[in-house]
């Protein structure tokens, strides 16, 4: 039976995302566990167009976009020491972390 922990990181700022991945990778490597990644996932770009003027000038518009960067880390065959090390990692406020436990048969 082979277990895996998949960690998905998501952020609007790529600098804070890279810093968070470095902290997680160093914490896992200190426990001598096998880690794959960081694997960069496709970025999601959301674009919004709004009118500058509420009435007359319909051709005058502003365009905004939000870029969401994503990374994936996979820890093969984790032990309780790895889970304890992951719980002690302090990450930046702008980074969203999703942790999935996958058990193989």
UniProtKB/Swiss-Prot annotation:
SMART domains to which the protein is assigned, alphabetical: Ribosomal_S10 (SM01403)
Q: What species was this sequence derived from?
A: Rickettsia bellii (strain OSU 85-389)
Describe its function: Involved in the binding of tRNA to the ribosomes.
Q: Is Protein biosynthesis one of the keywords UniProt gives this record?
A: no
Tell whether Ribonucleoprotein is among the UniProt keywords.
yes
Q: Which GO terms describe its molecular function?
A: structural constituent of ribosome; tRNA binding
PANTHER family recorded for this chain?
30S RIBOSOMAL PROTEIN S10 FAMILY MEMBER (PTHR11700)
What keywords sit in the KW lines? Ribonucleoprotein, Ribosomal protein
* Source species taxonomy: Bacteria, Pseudomonadati, Pseudomonadota, Alphaproteobacteria, Rickettsiales
Q: Which GO terms describe its cellular component?
A: ribonucleoprotein complex; ribosome
| Family according to the record | Belongs to the universal ribosomal protein uS10 family.
> Entry's Pfam families?
Ribosomal_S10
UniProt-recorded name of the protein: Small ribosomal subunit protein uS10
Subunit info here reads: Part of the 30S ribosomal subunit.
Q: Biological process GO annotation list?
A: translation
